[in-house]
Amino acid sequence: PSLGVLMTSALAAADEIIIPLQCEWFGLEGLSKIVHVIELIRESGSNVQLEGILMTMFDGRTNLSRDVVAEVEKYFPEQLYRAIIPRTIRLGEAPSHGKTIFEHDARGTGARAYEGFTDEFLARKAIEPVGLQ
């Protein structure tokens, strides 16, 4: 990701950061840059925290996806969410239809994965989920 002035300002203004990370090697490079910038921002007096890392575009058929998750787990075991967002056609289609995945394919694998992430996030924060009807 680009770490220009806007991104750096957003990081400095935030209390907590969740980093969505594609299961690709370039994603790991971006992660190391963001973590470094967060450290620099904290040194300047900000209290920003890395809340978590959400693995996205996971393809269980490839060693690459599994290797990237393993690498993140090795260095960020506490921050890594156990929920993993898979690479699916329906997740890719939803934005092109101007819809969320819950509008486009509410019972699909992608929607269920995001629901799992939401549940995990809320559990970490000790917040009771409110059902979407």
Language-model region placement:
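C-terminal helical "lid" subdomain and adjoining coupling/linker elements of P-loop NTPases
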Residues: 125-133
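Hydrophobic "lid"/C-terminal helical patch
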Residues: 72, 117-121
